[in-house]
């Protein structure tokens, strides 16, 4: 059985990685729009953009698989615990942002995180403690 914490962390790290790659691609698109005076530079930028988009597509495929696996575990949870675990591991939100979005204190968020992860570990097992 897969290590539930590792599965959740993998989904989160891929989400963060893809957000960074997409931001880089958006910057390159803005640069390519301004690079009209030099056709060689524009060609080079477009080629780099195409390569990065292919890499992002591959990463997105991996992320979808990782999120699907993580969601099979998370689906066991309900209510506030699920909202906190899903927000952090699937949507890659910070704890502060989750607290604001869910209208809760950070302390409450951390309590829900702990109880949710404890339930997942009891249900699915884990080699290491939180």
What does each of the following model-derived ranges do?
Residues 103-123:
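DNA-recognition helix of helix-turn-helix
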Residues 91-108:
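Helix-turn-helix DNA-binding module
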Residues 76-93:
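Short amphipathic alpha helix immediately N-terminal
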Residues 7, 64, 79, 104-105, ...:
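Short alpha-helical segments used as structural interaction elements across diverse proteins
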Residues 1-73, 97, 126-130:
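N-terminal interaction/assembly modules
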Residues 66-69, 73, 77-81, 112:
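N-terminal positioning helix adjacent to the helix-turn-helix/winged-helix DNA-binding module
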């Amino acid at each position: 059985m897969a290590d539930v914490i590792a599965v959740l962390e993998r989904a989160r790290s891929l989400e963060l990685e893809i957000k960074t790659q997409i931001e880089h691609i958006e910057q390159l698109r803005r640069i390519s729009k301004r690079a009209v005076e030099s056709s060689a530079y524009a060609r080079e930028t477009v080629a780099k953009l195409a390569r990065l988009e292919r890499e992002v597509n591959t990463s997105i495929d991996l992320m979808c698989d990782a999120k699907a696996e993580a969601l099979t575990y998370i689906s066991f949870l309900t209510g506030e615990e699920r909202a906190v675990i899903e927000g952090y591991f699937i949507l890659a939100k910070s704890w502060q942002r989750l607290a604001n979005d869910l209208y809760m204190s950070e302390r409450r968020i951390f309590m829900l995180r702990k109880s949710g992860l404890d339930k997942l570990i009891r249900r699915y097992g884990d080699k290491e403690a939180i």
